[in-house]
Amino acid sequence: MREIVHIQAGQCGNQIGAKFWEVISDEHGIDPSGTYSGDSDLQLERVDVFYNEATGGRYVPRAILMDLEPGTMDSVRAGPFGQLFRPDNFVFGQTGAGNNWAKGHYTEGAELIDAVLDVLRKEAEGCDCLQGFQITHSLGGGTGSGMGTLLISKIREEYPDRIMETFSVFPSPKVSDTVVEPYNATLSVHQLVENADEVQVIDNEALYDICFRTLKLTTPTYGDLNHLVSAAMSGVTCSLRFPGQLNSDLRKLAVNLIPFPRLHFFMYGFAPLTSRGSQQYRALTVPELTQQMFDAKNMMCTSDPRHGRYLTACAMFRGRMSTKEVDEQMLNVQNKNSSYFVEWIPHNTKSSVCDIPPLGLKMAVTFVGNSTAIQEMFKRVSDQFTAMFRRKAFLHWYTGEGMDEMEFTEAESNMNDLVSEYQQYQDATAEEEGEFEEEEGDVEA
């Protein structure tokens, strides 16, 4: 019941995805060959959210791996859990998108997309009651951003009533891999605003900061970063997979976190994060977890929640704890920091409690927040976009694939609208309700 089909697109998506399956397989006691070697019935009770049981008791992930070049796929296949995936579910081209959004969305990607959709339909048909899709991709490259958003819009057409959740790695302010990142990211956001239900915003710089500051790693690798992301990803779906006192799922998350349809970009965090050396010096209590998860240093994207206000927030606790204590703590945070929560949504935090903690921890919490501070992220990308677009730099790579300059202008204005919408709700107070409703009508139109 309540299955989720997982899709990983492009190099970044496949690397995060591979790490995610390692984490999930560990939680469910499934070894790299797909056989169950755990010790608790709870691990198998709802293993079918992410796994399909094949013949001979083998568990196969409901995962689709796609890329426009074979390189990353080969390394996933050669990786520790590479033999877990169904061989037919590797869909790849040979050319590569060359960091070009237009190639991923219009030319190369469009040729490969039907093959991906066929595999997707097979997976969806194998589901009892499909809850939705989760996609891991980056917005800076060509495949994850261009082809990823193409796939999202195709899935939207075919499964309009299913939840579409993406884990999107945004270009980071100081760490840039490619020159045309701002173009690719802006064009992608333009699509995500319209077609995705929830977008979890991640960026490498924030992850590096967490690794340096909190985990005290001297030379963090992408593996470490991806591990952070997958810990939080596993937390988002834990109540679907394990019994709990207070459940949440992707749809409940969406309903509780999205006050206006366009504002569905969430920042998220995970606690407890401690360096390996200092683990034994910390007591894990609900107050301590709550304290850390609301900490700005804990967010997986470079926007400071203290610069904006939370429209809504959601905390997914895992482990043995009293729900009373959880509720008290959440209320406590809201009362003490009331200026950081908008006043026109009275009880704007949701919490859920799941009994089974992640491996190696007694308690943990995943935090998802819808904060107006995320506009910093969009502003930053938008400024870089404008700087290049004003000079029409690198534009011929996109127009050469059949794109029109108009599309860039549209994407840019959509991004700027998004920023001003966040700003508008950040400044809104409970009193101006009357004039506000008229404005709201305009936004929708």
From Swiss-Prot:
Does the keyword field hold Magnesium? Answer: yes
GO cellular component annotations of the record: cytoplasm; microtubule
Question: Which keywords appear in this protein's UniProt record, sorted alphabetically?
Answer: Cytoplasm, Cytoskeleton, GTP-binding, Magnesium, Metal-binding, Microtubule, Nucleotide-binding
Entries under Pfam families matching the protein: Tubulin (PF00091), Tubulin_C (PF03953)
UniProt binding sites for GTP: 11, 69, 138, 142-144, 204, 226
Q: Which GO terms describe its biological process?
A: microtubule-based process
Q: Mark out the compositionally biased spans (Acidic residues).
A: 429-445
Q: What is this protein called?
A: Tubulin beta chain
